[in-house]
Swiss-Prot record:
Annotated protein name in UniProt: Multifunctional tryptophan biosynthesis protein
Organism lineage: Eukaryota, Fungi, Dikarya, Ascomycota, Taphrinomycotina
Chain residue ranges for the region called N-(5'-phosphoribosyl)anthranilate isomerase: 536-759
Keyword Nucleotide-binding: no
Organism: Schizosaccharomyces pombe (strain 972 / ATCC 24843)
Known pathway: Amino-acid biosynthesis; L-tryptophan biosynthesis; L-tryptophan from chorismate: step 1/5; Amino-acid biosynthesis; L-tryptophan biosynthesis; L-tryptophan from chorismate: step 3/5; Amino-acid biosynthesis; L-tryptophan biosynthesis; L-tryptophan from chorismate: step 4/5
Length: 759
């Protein structure tokens, strides 16, 4: 019979049928290799895991068949004396039986059992270590997720896996300062072990390491929802060729720049995951809450232009060093968007490229208001789904997947994961074999890097050589070494649909002009900010059908109906409905056709919509009134636009099913905030009140407003031309200036509109 031991819910097993029957839930099973440290490990397990029983069996007192009947949830192999082949009891057989079925953890001899079972050899470590504390570094993956570097661990061993026999299915996970291997992990199965003792009081982060093991629920990394990044194999290879005493310095000298970046990104990812609020679970929660901004179709956005420009934000690179360290990602991205870039590529790798996730975030925010905005690409060394979640949450529409860095299995997993978040990846290749892999993957956007990532040498013929392999429905992009219109023309002639330009744009004294040159665009095709055409006319305070007809017949563009209770200009609801019917069945006298302009800002685009409306636009004016009241008037009168003339919250704008004009004082910092109001209305404020007061705005100061805006306050038929000349508004708004004795004067309305339209 099993007996209870004083370690939480653990039981010491005797493998009898009764013992098996006693376990109602699936247990975590510890195989005890006759070592006193076994119970320290068990204590950690029982303190960390309260949901399932923990059963301990000596390695020669239970068979694997009997163990299988227990249907264990997880398997732990304890430390122990001797050699795993001679003294490990059922450990090796148990590993073989349960590999890929349940998570397995090996400690000290337990690791040696894993090593030997997978085809490696265990031999003398060259020294006897007993209670020695060493510093180790690790890869930040698997059970090391969220654990910092350079931690202290306690070692008790005289044997170790012979690294020259390291099985291909295992990866080195941790090592001492002088290169002695301290951990290994199976590449596919959720099997991992350490040579040191995480349960020792002198070992740092032992509980965290064991907790990561306990968090697993399945026998493979993939089933646990973990895409294990391709490891940097330079360390493994060097250790096979040398003894355990090979130094990490010697190993690093054999690494290519790509391998160095790869290794550093593994460390960066691990450090990010352990920050409060940035764990994998946290990021998944944010995605589930739909916190990520909307995503556009990367493939379709590229198809809109040929050639499509993928303009890059890049401060530095390993091959060129510093390029433009003071570059502001937001300004750079907006500049690219305004000249018609289809994609903004943002380097986020911090050490060699001097980028950051913040660059990605601000680049997206900067172009969010641009009409038909460019897609945002996170360009980085993507090796972990965590990076893809980061990208989506920070506004990316696509991520870069480099075939040279990933195994076929990992490439497929990351590709599918990106697609599951709505992002079509850009798959990068450098040779025919990689191109074949990308095509078989089903990639819709394939980029050829003319730069070999191992040597960083550029061969501009690489793209040309691979172009003929690409199916017709796949977008082919040239990703490097492009610095002139001639390069763009050359690739376009060979079927390349998109070009990525980074360094040349970053170094250009006038990036906008250089981008226009690359795309062969004239300056007239580029959005250049504020409108300089004849302003639209809005007559506010209209409260009769006759006045509305006069406005339309005279060429007015917008009719303002005031629904503010205390206003002397409040319109009767029945009259408002009559005016609405008339307005929506009458064509405007002056209609401005939409222009084919690249990279329009939010406000320019909204102005174009106003100017091109086929009928006059009906504007309902409200001031500090309930949201539901405004909604009811919108529905009853069929308003085209809502004008908020009070202190209404910005968030209301997205709750109203109509475009919104919002009033601001001249000194407001919110005037040019995009994605909310379609145009700001600038009015004079007297005693905190605005609208219909007959007070003028400072026209000279208004001329510096950087976006299309509505000018109101003190305008009359006599001064409106001067006001327009000085302040350059997109729309002029009049109410008291076309009244006589408090009533709308039809002749003044005609005179005001004519004065504007004859400019």
């Amino acid at each position: 019979m099993s007996e209870k031991v004083d370690v939480g819910e653990s039981v010491k097993g005797d493998a009898s049928e009764n013992a098996v029957k006693e376990v109602a839930e699936r247990p975590i099973v510890m195989i005890d290799n006759y070592d006193s440290f076994t119970w320290n490990v068990v204590q950690y397990l029982s303190n960390l895991e309260k949901r399932y029983p923990i059963m301990v069996f000596r390695n020669d007192e239970i068979t694997v068949d009997e163990l299988e009947k227990l249907n264990p949830l997880k398997l732990v192999l304890s430390p122990g004396p001797g050699h795993p082949a001679r003294d490990g009891g059922i450990c090796n057989e148990a590993i073989s039986r349960f590999a890929g079925k349940i998570p397995i953890l090996g400690v000290c001899m337990g690791l040696q059992c894993i090593f030997e079972t997978m085809g490696g050899k265990v031999d003398s470590a060259g020294e006897i270590i007993h209670g020695k504390v060493s510093k180790i570094n690790h890869d930040g993956l698997g059970f090391y997720q969220g654990i910092p570097q350079n931690i202290s661990v306690t070692r008790y061993h005289s044997l170790a896996g012979k690294i020259s026999s390291l099985p291909d299915c295992l990866d080195v996970t941790s090592w001492t300062e002088n290169g002695v291997i301290m951990g290994a992990r199976h590449k596919k199965y959720a099997i991992e072990g350490v040579q040191y003792h995480p349960e020792s009081i002198l070992s740092e982060y032992g509980k965290e390491y064991i907790q990561n093991f306990l968090n697993l629920t399945a026998g493979t990394w993939e089933e646990n929802g973990i895409v294990m990044p391709t490891k940097n194999n330079a360390f493994n290879a060097a250790m096979r060729e040398n003894s355990n005493s090979v130094s990490s310095t010697k190993i690093r000298k054999q690494e290519s720049i790509l391998e160095k970046i790869h290794a550093q990104r593994l460390i960066d990812i691990a450090e990010s995951k352990r920050k409060p609020g940035l764990s994998v679970g946290d990021l998944q929660t944010y995605l589930n809450l739909n916190i990520a901004p909307p995503c556009i179709n990367f493939y379709e956005r590229l198809k809109q232009s040929k050639p499509a420009l993928m303009a890059e934000v890049k401060r530095a690179s390993p091959s060129k060093g510093d390029i433009k360290l003071d570059a502001n990602a937001a300004i750079q991205a907006l500049t690219y968007a305004q000249v018609g870039a289809s994609v903004i590529s943002v380097l986020t790798e911090p050490k060699w490229f001097k980028g950051s996730l913040n660059d990605l975030f601000v680049a997206r925010k900067a172009v969010e208001h641009v009409a038909n905005r460019p897609a945002i690409l996170r360009k980085d060394f993507i090796i972990d789904p965590y990076q893809i979640m980061e990208a989506r949450l920070n506004g990316a529409d696509s991520v870069l997947l480099i075939v040279a860095m990933l195994s076929r299995e990992q490439l497929e997993s990351l590709y599918k994961f990106s697609k599951s978040l709505g992002m079509e990846p850009l798959v990068e290749v450098n040779c025919a074999e990689e191109m074949k892999t990308a095509i078989e993957l089903g990639a819709k956007v394939i980029g050829v890097n003319n730069r070999n990532l191992h040597s960083f040498e550029v061969d501009l013929s690489t793209t040309s050589k691979l172009a003929e392999m690409v199916p017709d429905d796949v977008i082919l992009a040239a990703l490097s070494g492009i610095s002139s219109p001639a390069d763009v023309a050359h690739y376009s002639s060979q079927g390349v649909s998109a070009v990525l330009v980074g360094e040349s744009l970053m170094r250009a004294s006038d990036p906008a002009a250089f981008a226009r040159e690359l795309l062969n665009l004239s300056s007239s095709e580029i959005s250049n900010g504020k409108k300089t055409s004849t302003p639209l006319v809005k007559v506010c305070g209209t409260r009769s059908l006759l006045a509305a007809k006069t406005i339309v017949e005279s060429g007015g563009d917008l009719i303002g109906l005031i629904f503010v209770e205390k206003s002397k200009r409040k319109v009767d609801l029945s009259v408002a409905k009559e005016i609405s019917h008339f307005v929506h069945t009458t064509n405007r006298k002056h209609i401005s056709p939409k222009k084919a302009v690249t990279g329009q800002s939010w406000f320019d685009h909204q102005y174009e919509n106003l100017a091109s409306s086929p009928h006059p636009l009906l504007v309902g004016v409200f001031q500090n009134q309930p949201l539901e009241y405004i909604r009811s008037i919108i529905a009853e009168v069929n308003l085209d636009i809502v004008q908020l003339h009070g202190q209404e919250p910005f968030e209301w704008i997205h709750m109203l099913d109509r475009p919104v004009i919002k009033v601001f004082p001249l000194n407001s910092s919110e005037i040019s905030r995009p994605n909310y109001h379609i145009v700001p209305l600038i009015d004079a404020y007297v005693g905190g009140e605005s609208g219909g007061l007959g007070k003028k705005v400072d026209w000279e100061a208004a001329s510096f407003i950087p976006v299309s805006y509505v000018l109101a306050g003190g305008l009359t038929p006599k001064n409106v031309q001067d006001a327009i000349s000085v302040s350059r508004p997109a729309v002029v708004d009049v109410s008291s200036g076309v009244e006589t004795d408090g009533k709308q004067d039809l002749e003044k309305i005609k005179a005001f509109i004519n004065a504007v339209k004859e400019l």
